[in-house]
């Protein structure tokens, strides 16, 4: 389906500093990458030229204004920019100067696609960890309960029932993609949209979610992460809470408006106070029981994990009933993700919670999240996206305890993202050393940093590990995984952490296609992994 809006119509909806050139054309797409601008054409009904609006976004490494000529050559009919514009003039093109080009791109994108979030029940999920799994679980439960939904997350997205791997490294895409995907969900008959709302996406610096009308906000947790972007943990938390502040701006669309918080996290009260709407908590800790009862939330008790999955009892303080629950998922932490998901689906649809709970055994794990790889080897291989100290503490203790009981050892392999928060690196090393018998450090996404220097910063956190026996630095990830498998024996566990679902490794001068699952499986069966 093609969407079009006149340039004049778009200009009326935004704050304009200056405008010159031809404003009679039609906009049929919004782009910030000049390479994606396609040749203009002419509208059959009006005869007017129609093409892309190019937004010259300011960036850390470059400025979008450098690509204006390229966008025009490729067929853009309108250029939006901020600041001064040098050596650009073309009578056939409309130039629009604005104060904030990112916010303007969000506004124009929403307008172009007829504000899709106005007709969808939109659930946003934020948190340092657990976002992608919770988004997927909400999406799955909605569809299992007969409520057509779409979603997008770090891992994958769906607009029409088909789940597609996310081609980007961004958790929350730029606003033009956000609005397009929401429009595609609406047009394919979806009633609900589940959105992974990262702190970057919720920050006014990016305005990626600026014009999304949220009906529900789900908060999972806040731990130290992305400080290279937010500056402080306080600002990081503040930006995440923008999801809950957005609930108060909802004009009312016929869906319930509410928040959900993980009451185990110390920041839960902060998020509850960020909105005037009802907020429902969940927890697995006895100390929170009174608060969960007071706010009519969900509580999980009698949690047991085995090789076949997880069992627990769910206490619903809204109906004051208890339900036995079964999950075919690994990782006790997934109980909290499921509590958030059940609560979100029940509150936004009004369905009987028992109908939702009976679908839980059908919920599937997310790619790259506690994924068990079995090629007949006598040791366990788990792939997980864990890449922060807090996520390490979520997965390591229970795995260590379980493997220790069987007499095995834990071998962990991971790295850390280049050009990102450096403070977490030695802490990653410390936690891994505490729970692992062998630590192997390998590339994650070194970007512009030297691989060995980066990995040595992690190694500084585990000085007690003997080099060459208990600690290895092997930048090439396939080679590092091969080493890990060579050291593994019966009843051992090899944890491949940090890449999860991602489809590449980013270096300074190149991006290498890479899939952790494919690489692991090839190495387990003895295949060549030179080009995984």
From Swiss-Prot:
It is an enzyme of class 6 (ligase). Pathway: Cell wall biogenesis; peptidoglycan biosynthesis. The keyword Chaperone does not apply. ATP binds at residues 127-133. SUPFAM superfamilies: MurD-like peptide ligases, catalytic domain (SSF53623), MurD-like peptide ligases, peptide-binding domain (SSF53244), MurE/MurF N-terminal domain (SSF63418). Belongs to the MurCDEF family. MurE subfamily. This is UDP-N-acetylmuramyl-tripeptide synthetase. It comes from Treponema denticola (strain ATCC 35405 / DSM 14222 / CIP 103919 / JCM 8153 / KCTC 15104).
């Amino acid at each position: 389906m093609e969407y079009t809006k006149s340039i004049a119509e778009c200009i009326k909806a935004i704050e304009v500093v200056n405008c010159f050139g031809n404003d009679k054309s039609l906009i049929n797409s919004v782009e910030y990458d000049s390479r994606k601008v396609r040749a203009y054409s002419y509208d059959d009904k009006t005869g007017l030229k129609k093409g892309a609006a190019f937004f010259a976004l300011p960036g850390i490494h470059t400025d979008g204004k450098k690509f204006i000529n390229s966008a025009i050559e490729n067929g853009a009919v309108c250029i939006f920019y901020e600041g001064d514009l040098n050596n650009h003039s073309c009578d056939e093109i409309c130039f629009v100067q604005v104060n904030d080009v990112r916010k303007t791109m969000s506004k124009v994108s929403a307008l172009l696609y007829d504000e899709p979030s106005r007709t969808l029940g939109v659930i946003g999920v934020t948190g340092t960890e657990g976002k992608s799994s919770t988004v997927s679980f909400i999406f799955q439960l909605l569809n299992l309960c007969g409520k057509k939904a779409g979603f997008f997350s770090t891992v994958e997205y769906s607009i029409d029932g088909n789940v597609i791997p996310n081609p980007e490294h961004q958790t929350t895409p730029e606003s033009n993609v956000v609005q397009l995907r929401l429009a595609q969900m609406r047009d394919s008959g979806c009633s609900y949209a589940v959105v992974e709302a990262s702190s970057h996406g919720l920050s006014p610096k990016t305005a990626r979610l600026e014009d999304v009308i949220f009906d529900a906000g789900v908060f999972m947790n806040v731990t130290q992460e992305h400080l290279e972007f937010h500056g402080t943990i306080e600002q990081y938390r503040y930006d995440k809470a923008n999801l809950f502040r957005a609930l108060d701006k909802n004009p009312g669309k016929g869906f319930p408006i509410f928040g959900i918080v993980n009451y185990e996290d110390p920041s839960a009260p902060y998020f509850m106070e960020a909105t005037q709407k009802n907020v429902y908590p969940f927890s697995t800790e006895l100390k929170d029981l009174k608060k969960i009862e007071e706010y009519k939330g969900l509580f999980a008790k009698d949690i047991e994990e085995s090789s076949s999955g997880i069992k627990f009892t769910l206490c619903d303080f809204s109906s004051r009933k208890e339900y036995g629950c079964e999950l075919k998922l690994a990782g006790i932490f997934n109980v909290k993700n499921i509590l958030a998901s059940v609560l979100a689906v029940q509150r936004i649809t009004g369905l009987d919670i028992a109908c939702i709970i009976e679908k839980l055994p059908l919920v599937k794990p997310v790619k790259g999240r506690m994924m068990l790889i079995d090629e007949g080897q006598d040791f366990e291989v788990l792939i997980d996206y864990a890449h922060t100290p807090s996520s390490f503490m979520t997965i390591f203790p229970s795995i260590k305890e379980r493997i220790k009981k069987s007499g095995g050892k834990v071998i962990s392999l991971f790295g850390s993202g280049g050009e990102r928060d450096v403070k977490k690196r030695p802490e990653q090393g410390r936690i891994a050393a505490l729970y692992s018998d062998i630590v192997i450090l390998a590339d994650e996404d070194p970007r512009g940093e030297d691989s060995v220097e980066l990995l040595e910063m992690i190694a500084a956190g585990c000085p007690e590990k003997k080099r060459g026996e208990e600690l290895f630095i092997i930048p090439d990830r396939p080679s590092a995984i091969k080493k890990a498998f060579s050291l593994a024996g019966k009843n051992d566990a090899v944890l491949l952490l940090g890449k999860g679902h991602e489809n590449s490794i980013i270096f300074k001068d190149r991006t290498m296609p890479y899939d952790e699952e494919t690489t692991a499986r090839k190495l387990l069966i003895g295949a060549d992994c030179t080009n995984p």
